[in-house]
Amino acid sequence: MRMKKILSVLAGLILFANTTFAEELSIEKQLVGIVGAINGTVKTETRTLKAGDKIYLNETIYASENSGTQILLLDQSTFTIGSESEVVMDTFIYDPETSDGKIVASVKQGSLKVISGLISKKNPDSLTVEVPEGTLGSRGTEFQTNVSKGKTDTLLIGPGKNNTL
């Protein structure tokens, strides 16, 4: 009787472990781009980044003092993250066959320079950057924003179809 109980508990544990392991394997991270260049120390919540590393949806990128990185997104947009910055890739939807999609990033602190890629060239309203004071739309152009102590400064660099934010 005791042996049956032990075997039942072991079978239950094995079944639970296999189910949990299978669930973990099915959770696939969504790739949004790669690190093209890096200077100094740039990290995510779980790793220190180097050139060629993949960037995934919902990752927070932290650039320390005197550091920065350039992220090349799958739609050919470029995000350059400056020193002492914190940027999150919130939304990335991209169909490479049609260039349809949507990109949303958040700048919590520091600087982000954006050069629009295929998604926002097709639909200028489809790339936005959230900052503490509101939302910036790229409108198919190039811009840089800096968030410091809750205040946001934004520079329109251009060129863009409408050259507006």
Segments from the language model and where they lie:
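Bacterial N-terminal signal peptides that target proteins for export
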Residues: M1-L7
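Intrinsically disordered, low-complexity segments enriched in glycine/proline and serine/threonine
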Residues: L7-S8, Y62
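Intrinsically disordered and other compositionally biased segments
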Residues: S8-V9, A22
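Bacterial N-terminal signal peptides
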Residues: V9-A17
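Flexible, surface-exposed loop/linker segments and immediately adjacent secondary-structure boundaries
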Residues: A22-S64, G68-T69, L73-L165
